[in-house]
Amino acid sequence: MFKFNDEKGQLKCSFCGKTQTQVRKLVAGPGVYICDECIELCTEIVQEELAKDEEVEFKDVPKPVEIREILDEYVIGQDSAKKALAVAVYNHYKRINSNSKIDDVELAKSNIALIGPTGSGKTLLAQTLARILNVPFAIADATSLTEAGYVGEDVENILLKLIQAADYDVEKAEKGIIYIDEIDKVARKSENPSITRDVSGEGVQQALLKILEGTVASVPPQGGRKHPHQEFIQIDTTNILFICGGAFDGIEPIIKRRLGEKVIGFGSEKKNADVNEKHVLSHVLPEDLLRFGLIPEFIGRLPVIANLEPLDEDALVDILTKPKNALVKQFQKLLELDDVELEFEEGALIEIAKKAIERKTGARGLRSIIEGLMLDVMFELPSRKDIEKCILTKETVADNEPPKLVLQDGTVLDTKTSA
């Protein structure tokens, strides 16, 4: 056996140097030794670091103003939604830190409903919140869920995604955030209860009630359906923040009708002419969600309702250029790796925004538009060492003309003949 060079030939701890006679235990490894005292000290250090991490995550929750400022770095516009989210998230984690009770007053959970058109930033807001708070985050699609006992995913599979995001640390997952997308797709077909089964609509809402409110759920570790002979992961959903997002197409007429505006009719004046067509969603109330098809119990578990406005041309141009991870910056970085400078003319940015509005895809469609414009250039450039700059012009977007390529000697290359 390996021995350290000391006069008595005794084994020593590789960390503190104490001999085996000076300590109670000496644990041997391949050529190294550690004593029980050093093991105890290392354990304390690790526990302190873990406690410090937890303290950073859940004790030092950013103030609503700070949350809003960080959201501004990644998400353009949507000021009212950011404010509502910042307050709701701050109150949620403040509630966790107080153990849900202050002077015997129990603090209820503030789950959030995000209502806004496709591509307005619902998912990005939820993702950014999780990044700010350094908590596990999972996205689930409500359209894949069905009531227990039917073909489709059980609602418990949503919780499994969160547990996986937390590397199977259940305690950490219990303080995470779950974003359920397309929640409007599980609205029942009419606001009146049906005597027939609606397994992908009202049935899903019923199944989600318990986990939204707070319950100890049994989650199959491998996903899929439950069966009696398998082990389950137990997770308490009381402190999990749920954000339910959806476009809620068709809710605007419901809101207008409530506000007293005539949706159909000739020769009748609008009773509420102040309602701007673009800002109808800002007037949404729980009763509108009820008429849309969400059940009262489900609406009651989403006390915070934040609406996102459709993005206009200016907002889309800002989204292309201003955020930390703006698409223009991403594509410039991609070409920079091939030693090529990429420039977007102002006219090109405006035309890209117009195309996204025409396609009704919002910010989500911006990337696919730029990918289409850049495909030929990104195919050719890695093989060319004489190109110094690529310029996307208004004509590139509007008239499908190729981008301008500038050679190292300053010559502007006609890409139509460059191949």
Swiss-Prot record:
One GO term describing the cellular component: HslUV protease complex
Pfam families in alphabetical order: AAA_2, ClpB_D2-small, zf-C4_ClpX
Region forming the signal peptide: none
Keywords, comma-separated and alphabetical: ATP-binding, Chaperone, Metal-binding, Nucleotide-binding, Zinc
Domain called ClpX-type ZB: residue spans: 1-54
InterPro entries: AAA+_ATPase (IPR003593), ATP-dep_Clp_protease_ClpX (IPR050052), ATPase_AAA_core (IPR003959), Clp_ATPase_C (IPR019489), Clp_protease_ATP-bd_su_ClpX (IPR004487), ClpX_bact (IPR046425), P-loop_NTPase (IPR027417), Znf_CppX_C4 (IPR010603)
Binding residues annotated for ATP, in chain numbering: P117, T118, G119, S120, G121, K122, T123, L124
GO annotation (BP), single: proteolysis involved in protein catabolic process
Binding-site positions, Zn(2+): C13, C16, C35, C38
Gene3D superfamilies on file: 1.10.8.60, ClpX chaperone, C4-type zinc finger domain (6.20.220.10), P-loop containing nucleotide triphosphate hydrolases (3.40.50.300)
Matches recorded under SUPFAM superfamilies: Glucocorticoid receptor-like (DNA-binding domain) (SSF57716), P-loop containing nucleoside triphosphate hydrolases (SSF52540)
One MF term in the entry's GO annotations: ATP binding
Function (record text): ATP-dependent specificity component of the Clp protease. It directs the protease to specific substrates. Can perform chaperone functions in the absence of ClpP.
Entry similarity comment: Belongs to the ClpX chaperone family.
Assembly notes: Component of the ClpX-ClpP complex. Forms a hexameric ring that, in the presence of ATP, binds to fourteen ClpP subunits assembled into a disk-like structure with a central cavity, resembling the structure of eukaryotic proteasomes.
Name of the protein in question: ATP-dependent Clp protease ATP-binding subunit ClpX
Record organism: Bacillus cereus (strain ATCC 14579 / DSM 31 / CCUG 7414 / JCM 2152 / NBRC 15305 / NCIMB 9373 / NCTC 2599 / NRRL B-3711)
